[in-house]
């Protein structure tokens, strides 16, 4: 089982269809790191329990798509190039 999963936001994208947010979820932690062009390496969003974290994911599950680490790096590179 993978310890870290990455999900891109499919609703909020820029004009080139790149996501404006990526969610980094680590299996054993009660936080989700939210990556965006202002926080390329991520900023933590804490939960009171793994259950509340999983509930958050269930709420947004229709608007996210799982990506692999290579796609994450590609998106981060795009954000770095296009920061204004």
Spans of model-derived segments:
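Acidic, low-complexity, intrinsically disordered interaction modules
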Residues: 13-62
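Residue-level detector of alpha-helical secondary structure
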Residues: 53, 57, 61, 65, ...
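Short intrinsically disordered terminal tails
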Residues: 1-2, 80-84
């Amino acid at each position: 089982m993978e310890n870290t999963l990455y999900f891109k936001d499919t609703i909020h994208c820029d004009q080139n269809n790149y996501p404006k947010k990526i969610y980094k979820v680590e299996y054993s932690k009660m936080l989700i790191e939210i990556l965006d062009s202002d926080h390329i390496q991520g900023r933590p969003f804490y939960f009171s329990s793994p259950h509340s974290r999983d509930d958050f994911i269930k709420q947004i599950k229709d608007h996210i798509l799982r990506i692999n680490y290579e796609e994450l790096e590609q998106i981060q590179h795009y954000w770095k190039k296009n920061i204004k």
